[in-house]
């Protein structure tokens, strides 16, 4: 907690106003669409309604916020998160850098509202999809104005190859993929006598909406398997309480090289169940047969 002492020009002697600063959590949503929402394919509104679309079961949203606050490790947060709408209009009418610029402009124009009650405490960001670029712009503006960004978490960041982060605050990017079994021929004789021996193999598929793009300037980028998801649901699967445990693991894991049959491959020290790629390095995973 930070105590700011403000002395009025009219104050007599030691008459002072004490303002208590408290950390603030900012949630920046991605693209939403009312028409697609009518088919249950997208959030239909921004801000709280966007996040609660993915956290729909009872108590899930509150649990998400509480777990996020514990993850960031600060204390005495402001009562409610601040919401920012990072959505483009059509989902393809803005580049990542366009949205970063918009986020920067929004923060500069609304600096008092965004930082209300913060004092000298830290601001923390959680963004999803298109909101990641917008959050990057907001963070840039806040730091330029002298505020402290404690950390920014970017979930399923869209168009990560079209914007950067400055690197002057902790920023972690995480994207999900899913596993799908595909049948492969074990042998092939001829078109007249094709092989009928098939074996299913597990293939990793990345989130089709955002692809594999590490944002320049992030501290670390992780691409992981979101089990029990599929093509239609993997993009929103990063918005869940467990994502913060995954982020903790991302921060502390170690990637090490090993030689196997004359080739170098990369493994995660202590074993690997969920990770497919760390930063620019694909890692061995026993749950993936085909990369």
Identify the role of each PLM range.
Residues 89-90, 165-291:
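C-terminal catalytic-base region of ester-bond hydrolases, centering on the histidine
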Residues 25, 29-32, 96-208, 216, ...:
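Serine-dependent carboxylesterase/thioesterase catalytic core
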Residues 1-4:
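A short beta-strand micro-motif common to beta-rich folds, especially ectodomain repeats
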Residues 9-19:
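Long, low-complexity ectodomains and other extracytoplasmic segments of secretory-pathway proteins
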Residues 18-120:
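Active-site catalytic motif of lipid deacylating hydrolases and related acyltransferases
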Residues 22-23, 54-63, 134-136, 141, ...:
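Extended low-polarity, hydrophobic cluster-rich segments
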């Amino acid at each position: 907690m930070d105590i700011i002492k403000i002395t009025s020009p009219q104050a007599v002697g030691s008459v002072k106003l004490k303002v208590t600063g408290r950390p603030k959590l900012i949630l920046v949503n991605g693209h939403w669409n009312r028409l697609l929402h009518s088919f249950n394919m997208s959030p239909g509104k921004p801000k709280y309604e966007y996040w609660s679309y993915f956290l729909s079961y009872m108590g899930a949203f509150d649990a998400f916020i509480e777990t996020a606050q514990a993850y960031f490790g600060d204390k005495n947060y402001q009562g409610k998160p601040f919401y920012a709408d990072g959505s483009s209009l059509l989902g393809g009418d803005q580049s990542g850098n366009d949205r970063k610029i918009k986020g920067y402009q929004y923060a500069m124009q609304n600096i008092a509202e965004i930082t209300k009650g913060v004092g000298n405490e830290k601001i923390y960001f959680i963004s999803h999809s298109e909101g990641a670029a917008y959050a990057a712009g907001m963070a840039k503006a806040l730091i330029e104005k002298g505020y402290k960004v404690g950390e920014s978490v970017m979930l399923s960041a869209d168009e990560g190859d079209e914007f950067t982060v400055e690197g002057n605050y902790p920023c972690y990017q995480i994207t999900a993929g899913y596993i799908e079994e595909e049948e492969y021929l074990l042998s092939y004789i001829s078109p007249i006598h094709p092989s009928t021996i098939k074996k299913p193999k597990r293939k990793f598929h990345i989130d089709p909406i955002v692809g594999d793009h590490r944002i320049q300037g992030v501290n670390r980028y992780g691409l992981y398997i979101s089990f029990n998801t599929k093509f239609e649901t993997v993009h929103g699967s990063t918005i869940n309480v467990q994502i913060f445990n995954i982020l903790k693991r991302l921060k502390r894991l170690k990637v090490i090289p090993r030689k196997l049959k004359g080739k170098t491959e990369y493994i995660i020290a202590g074993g690997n169940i969920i990770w497919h790629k760390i930063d620019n390095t694909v890692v061995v995973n026993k749950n993936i047969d085909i990369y």
